[in-house]
Amino acid sequence: MILAEMPPLDGGIVIHSGNISQAKQYLGQEHPYAIYDMRAEGDVWLNLDALAIIAGTIQAQGTLYLICPNWDTLEQQLDFDSQRWNGGKVIATPNFYRYFKALVQKFGFQFQTLEETDFSLPKQPPQCQATESLTPQQQKIFEKLPLDSSAIHLITAPRGRGKSTLAGKLAQQLAKTESVLITARSHSVLPSFWKSVAQHIPFFAPDHLLQKIAANQIAAKSWLFIDESASLPLPMLHQFCEYFDKVVLTTTTHNYEGTGRGFSLKFPQQLTKQYREWRLTKPLRWHENDPLEQFIDELLIMSPPSETNQYAEFYHLLAEAHYKTTPSDLRRLFDAQDQLLHSFSEHQRLVGGIWAVPEGDLEPELAEAIWRGERRPQGNLVAQYLCFQGNLLEACQLRSVRISRIAVQPELQKQGIGKRLISDFILQKIQQTRPLVDYVSVSFGLSEPLLHFWQQCGFQLVQITPTKEASSGYHSAMMLYPISAEGQRFVQQATARFERDLALQPFYAELQNMLPIRPLVQLQMDEQDWRNIEGFALAQRSLAASYVSLTRLYRQDPRNHGVLANLWQQFERIQGKKEWLENLRSLLANYLQYTR
């Protein structure tokens, strides 16, 4: 570990401060050394995702160099990475850096405090040459997997174990007698071995592959290989697994994206075909018990923390119980301002916990600008969405708390612990807060089990996103729990408006069997509809936020508003969306000028 400037050498890579996009270019590559430069405008910038990525590219006997200014005062320095996860505000992050420095000391990494003028990198040791032959562990899977009766195969391994090479060689072998396809998040992130065989084995982008499946233009009797499958939405993976006769998925445990055991737990739950998991454990890129790998694993809390630390224990619980938990969550948990933690332990073991953040209590002028579509400040996820998309201005003005995560140890789930956590959190934390919180909110990927869980906890459904989230493959649902008298009135208003609009929403036909709501089919315009249309025509409210009100206007007078027919379908098909929207706003503005 170097605390000074250093010049690059041939073959190495240099990452500057929080440049995650630069770091991602090196995924799947190998380098003799890497330099991570933490310096940023007189302070520091440490992006854990970027650090973990470049650490995973270093070959055996290679070195990671860290340029860190003012090591002794690191806890007091501003960290510009905090603006990503602290509502846009740059803060010092003392809790994380105390933890970080303790790990550096534990592993005994070398320090050198040097000036630019008197330093040169030491000579790099000769690198181990990569071998094309399979290890005994790889060879065993190579021979057994094609003969196994399971339809779905998941190959898991930490970085540097050769899972992509193994999968590539399997694909090459199978392609001699079978139809074989490859897919991944994008072609650019495929490891080099996959790219070398792509001319013989066709690659399909995931969305393109789904289109081929829908059009019945691709043979189901094929082997589909999915590289780094945890980076794709679970519903998409399940579609692939249902369609193809044989599917081989690879994914990285101890991943910089946080998709480790959580993926292995969640993925098999909805499979209808026989499934088998194969594991690679022996490192190929470096030696067993490599100190840098162990340091990164401990830094990202990939295993239960060896020493008592509230934040580390809580983060490990999240990583175990959640499909997507990232290093950014780790930084946020350690040092973000204005967050609430509530935990439940038994026999000195953390069993479950809730992570929540305050929202709302915004100035009326800012809330109005959010409603108009003119401001999008960071934070206030549910409050802003209800204000803008739900046409509920008060959502941003009232005081609320959003439950960001709830987690229970995987082996103890479905035993009522989650409901107990919610109840205790509201009774012990929320209802004791002064000034009193008006409501508690939660947002989650909409599925029947989760909807049922939150309803049993007393939450009421008030909003569903019109489109599915790319990261999860689900529509997002938002539910509220009233606390104050003002909150009671607001939640009743939000629920009534949601039920009034539901049958006209573009997603209703898809979700109606899941929703335990009998919608109120009301086509008559009210004042909120007119205000919504004015916000669309005269301000910057979106088509999605105004869609139901525009549909009511069309239904009220279809002869004079033919342009509003099938709005959602028009918008999805149209090429010049921006110009089309501006024309629609102009037409409605003229209409309002003569009718309102």
Swiss-Prot record:
Residues in N-acetyltransferase domain copies: 328-481
Function per UniProt: Catalyzes the formation of N(4)-acetylcytidine (ac(4)C) at the wobble position of tRNA(Met), by using acetyl-CoA as an acetyl donor and ATP (or GTP).
Lineage of source species: Bacteria, Pseudomonadati, Pseudomonadota, Gammaproteobacteria, Pasteurellales
PROSITE patterns: GNAT (PS51186)
Protein name according to UniProt: tRNA(Met) cytidine acetyltransferase TmcA
Cellular localization per UniProt: Cytoplasm
Organism superkingdom: Bacteria
Family annotation (Gene3D superfamilies): 3.40.50.11040, 3.40.630.30, P-loop containing nucleotide triphosphate hydrolases, tRNA(Met) cytidine acetyltransferase, tail domain
Family in the record: Belongs to the RNA cytidine acetyltransferase family. TmcA subfamily.
GO molecular function: 18S rRNA cytidine N-acetyltransferase activity; ATP binding; tRNA binding; tRNA N4-acetyltransferase activity
The enzyme's E.C. designation: 2.3.1.193
Annotated source species: Actinobacillus pleuropneumoniae serotype 5b (strain L20)
Gene from which this protein is expressed: tmcA
HAMAP family: tRNA_acetyltr_TmcA (MF_01886)
Residues engaged in binding acetyl-CoA: 406-408, 413-419
